[in-house]
């Protein structure tokens, strides 16, 4: 079938929801971005596999969870977006202190689920504003914890809808980076934690969230950390040392609370404002420190606004 002529009749056997020309701003934590040509909300993993198997092999695909760590440009995305958040949301307690979690589960939910089941080592997920699929994709972490330190195995799916089970040794895992995925996406993982105490873990989560609220602009639209920390230093320290706190382009502002955050002030920024500010910060830091800040955030889509 031709994706350009795709309509709901093409997915009559699917159980999910297919939307057309769907604005993406509401699906991202920055609250910016143009529309997706198509957006699919799968009912479950089997439904996702069926949907993918019927797409043209060259169809552009974008996977979104909570939409953190992503900047969708104002022109939107001309392919199909797969939305996992609120869809692939199963968590199952297994034996041997293990949990099976699907990609659409929020990291915060995973932290609470593990704590309430007397497992420790996953409290740090409460501080990650994304889904477990995204956490697996970039080895997300904070407060001394990283996602892949707990991975026993993962399930991936390719654009033909074929599902594989893979082991950690098949990937190259580093700081905020996972290589070896190829043209596949994470759909679930088996994670092993340590025996713990529910009350202790829940208190750790409470303390972590309080610290996050105190040190990060959690009451403003943001994507999380914009840049990776360079070896032996912190991106926020470098940005602040260059006098960039509070610098703005349009409604995009370098946070006064944490310099490695760019906020969409009162929802007035465009994606173009944010992207321009990212480049400005990189340029100023490079000029003043000779250090190249590497983006943690992914920039996606068409910069030009389309007339539809």
From Swiss-Prot:
Active site, renumbered: 176, 225 (proton donor), 296
Cofactor (UniProt): FAD
GO BP term, pick one: cell division
Coiled-coil intervals: none
EC number in record: 1.3.1.98
Localization terms from the record: Cytoplasm
Catalytic reaction equation(s): UDP-N-acetyl-alpha-D-muramate + NADP(+) = UDP-N-acetyl-3-O-(1-carboxyvinyl)-alpha-D-glucosamine + NADPH + H(+)
Superkingdom of this protein's organism: Bacteria
Enzyme type, top EC level: oxidoreductase
GO molecular function: FAD binding; UDP-N-acetylmuramate dehydrogenase activity
UniProt keywords, alphabetically: Cell cycle, Cell division, Cell shape, Cell wall biogenesis/degradation, Cytoplasm, FAD, Flavoprotein, NADP, Oxidoreductase, Peptidoglycan synthesis
A Gene Ontology cellular-component term: cytosol
InterPro entries tied to this protein: FAD-bd_PCMH (IPR016166), FAD-bd_PCMH-like_sf (IPR036318), FAD-bd_PCMH_sub1 (IPR016167), FAD-bd_PCMH_sub2 (IPR016169), MurB (IPR003170), MurB_C (IPR011601), MurB_C_sf (IPR036635), Oxid_FAD_bind_N (IPR006094)
All residue ranges annotated as the FAD-binding PCMH-type domain in the record: 32-196
Pathway: Cell wall biogenesis; peptidoglycan biosynthesis
Family statement drawn from the similarity comment of this UniProt entry: Belongs to the MurB family.
Primary role: Cell wall formation.
Alphabetical list of NCBIfam families matching this protein: murB, PRK13905.1
Protein name as it appears in the record: UDP-N-acetylenolpyruvoylglucosamine reductase
């Amino acid at each position: 079938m031709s994706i350009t002529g795709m309509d709901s009749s093409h997915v009559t056997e699917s159980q999910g929801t297919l939307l057309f020309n769907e604005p993406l701003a509401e699906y991202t934590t920055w609250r910016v971005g143009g529309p997706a040509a198509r957006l699919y909300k799968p009912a479950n993993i089997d439904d996702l596999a069926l949907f993918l198997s019927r797409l043209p092999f060259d169809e552009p695909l974008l996977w979104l969870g909570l939409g953190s760590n992503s900047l969708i440009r104002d022109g939107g995305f001309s392919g199909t977006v797969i939305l996992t958040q609120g869809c692939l949301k199963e968590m199952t307690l297994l034996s041997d202190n293990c949990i099976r979690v699907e990609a659409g589960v929020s990291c915060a939910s995973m932290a609470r689920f593990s704590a309430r089941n007397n497992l420790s080592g996953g409290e740090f997920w409460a501080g990650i504003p994304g889904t477990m699929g995204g956490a697996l994709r970039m080895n997300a972490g904070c407060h001394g914890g990283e996602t892949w330190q707990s991975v026993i195995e993962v399930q991936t799916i390719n654009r033909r809808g074929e599902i594989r089970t893979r082991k950690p040794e098949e990937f190259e895992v580093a700081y905020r980076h996972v290589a070896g995925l190829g043209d596949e996406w994470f759909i679930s993982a088996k994670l092993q934690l340590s025996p713990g105490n529910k009350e202790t873990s829940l208190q750790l989560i409470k303390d972590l969230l309080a610290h996050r609220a105190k040190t990060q602009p959690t009451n403003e639209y943001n994507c999380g950390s914009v840049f990776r920390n360079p070896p032996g230093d912190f991106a926020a320290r470098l940005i602040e040392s260059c006098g960039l706190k509070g610098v703005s382009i349009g409604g995009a502002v370098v946070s006064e609370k944490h310099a490695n955050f760019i906020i969409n002030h009162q929802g007035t920024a465009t994606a173009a404002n944010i992207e321009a500010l990212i480049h400005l910060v990189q340029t100023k830091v490079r000029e003043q420190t000779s250090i190249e800040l590497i983006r943690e955030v992914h920039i996606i889509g068409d910069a030009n606004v389309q007339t539809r």
